[in-house]
């Protein structure tokens, strides 16, 4: 399996700014060949007990976390005890590993504990792109009746000034983005603004799955009292993942969708959008923000 980045030769074209003096004649366009660093994107197959569950396009790295977090977001597992073994495969051979070890392939196979089952509705035989998972696959009613929801019991209060500072802290921790400019990120923070973990990926939902998987594998679920920040927008699926991980606050630098706001409201999640500079829009769960 390759790394998180790949180098590629590109043609750099520069168009000069218009001459404010109105000089006549065509502008001179310059071009030069150079090497550029790109964010890697490869398929990852997720299997449960040897049976294919889904395939997603992701940035390689933290694949076991991604697979484990995906199972949490699909309400298949709730804690570390629901998983008995994890294997990473290269397509022909598989090796058992601790989740902290390096991955060796593009398939993750997870063995579930006795009594933990994958429902027929959760099984997928199609490709999930890096831009979005299967948004809205699970209905709001289905999610809100799960034991993980609603989140109303989590009465953590967050300071608006602390929330406003999170985007800068997330950007400082985005090591691969700083070299490629091509990755989304998700960061998990305490209510006091301390960064617990950050993950980067070509897909926002993958980055969130990696964080949730990290929490599951380290026996930290549910993530009560935490805030999750994502780059880009907040979709229904990201709200679903936050709710099922027990995260009481989800913030995004862009807008949420209408269905995301509806689910957040029903599940008791504080949903924040347009978190930029000193301002933010609070769509649901305003009681968790101090006056």
Locate each region found by the language model.
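Generic hydrophobic/aromatic pocket-lining and core-packing "Φ" positions
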Residues: 208, 239, 260-261
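C-terminal binding/interaction regions
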Residues: 255, 259-291
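Short, structured coil segments at secondary-structure junctions
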Residues: 245-246, 267
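Structural detector of well-ordered beta-strand residues that form the stable sheet scaffold
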Residues: 229, 250-251, 272
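A conserved acidic, glycine/proline-rich C-terminal tail/linker
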Residues: 246-258
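Intrinsically disordered, low-complexity regions enriched in acidic/Ser/Thr/Pro/Gln residues
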Residues: 1-186, 190-191, 195-198
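Helix-rich terminal scaffold detector
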Residues: 235-237, 250
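Glycine- and Gly-Pro-enriched alpha-helical subdomains that act as flexible
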Residues: 176-232, 244
């Amino acid at each position: 399996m390759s790394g998180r980045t790949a180098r590629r030769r590109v043609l750099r074209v520069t168009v000069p700014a218009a001459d404010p003096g109105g000089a006549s004649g065509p502008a001179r366009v310059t071009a030069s060949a150079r090497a550029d660093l790109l964010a890697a994107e490869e398929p990852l197959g997720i299997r449960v007990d040897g049976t294919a569950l889904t395939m997603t396009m992701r940035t390689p790295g933290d694949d076991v976390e991604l697979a484990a977090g995906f199972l949490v977001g699909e309400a298949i597992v709730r804690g570390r005890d629901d998983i008995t073994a994890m294997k990473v495969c290269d397509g022909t051979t598989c090796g058992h590993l601790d989740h902290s070890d390096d991955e060796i392939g593009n398939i993750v196979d997870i063995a579930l504990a006795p009594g933990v089952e994958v429902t027929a509705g959760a099984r997928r035989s199609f490709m999930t792109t890096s831009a979005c998972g299967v948004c809205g696959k699970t209905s709001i009613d289905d999610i809100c009746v799960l034991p993980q929801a609603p989140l109303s019991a989590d009465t953590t209060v967050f300071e608006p000034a602390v929330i406003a500072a999170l985007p800068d802290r997330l950007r400082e921790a985005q090591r691969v983005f700083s070299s490629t400019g091509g990755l989304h990120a998700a960061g998990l923070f305490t209510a006091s603004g301390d960064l617990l973990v950050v993950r980067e990926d070509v897909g926002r939902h993958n980055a969130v799955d990696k964080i949730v998987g990290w929490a599951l594998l380290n026996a930290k679920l549910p993530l009560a009292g935490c805030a999750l920040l994502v780059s880009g927008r907040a979709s229904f699926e990201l709200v679903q993942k936050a709710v099922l991980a027990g995260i009481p606050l989800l913030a995004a630098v862009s807008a949420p969708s209408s269905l995301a706001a509806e689910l957040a409201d029903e599940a008791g999640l504080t949903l924040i959008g347009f978190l930029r500079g000193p301002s933010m829009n609070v769509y649901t769960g305003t009681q968790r923000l101090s006056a």
